[in-house]
Amino acid sequence: MLINRNLIVLDLEAKCKTEVIKKMIDLAYKEDRIISKEDFLKCVLEREEEISTGVGNGIAIPHGKSETVKEALIVFAKLKNGIDWESMDSEKVDLIFLLGVPERNKENLHLKILAQLSRKLMDEDFVKLLRNSSTEEEVYYILRSIEAS
């Protein structure tokens, strides 16, 4: 399962995108979804250097494909205060979806997940539900619809 309640954090406080990504990777590590925090962080930050994953509308989708990822995952964070993510629209980011996919995955699973997620994020009502949610449980049920689509 891509999403679980323990991979959701609300009101995350961070000063920069690297700090956000580190905190999100910590969650994945605590849930035993990745083997090495350092290796996965390096992978995600290298991808981020290629081109920012700030997709606009206050949303970022950092991601990485790495042998340190045990099984595909999504970590979700809603920030207490938006931060600069070098987004296409220059808006501060407050909703982050960190995707991780095992390197050995040959079906381009990360592209399929990105496509599903992108479709959902084009729905303003879906994004509004996420922004207005106040509990991890609420967010969990909203995000489950990604796997169903």
Task: Give, region by region, the residue ranges found by the protein language model.
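Cytosolic covalent-transfer regions centered on His/Cys nucleophiles
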Residues: 1-149
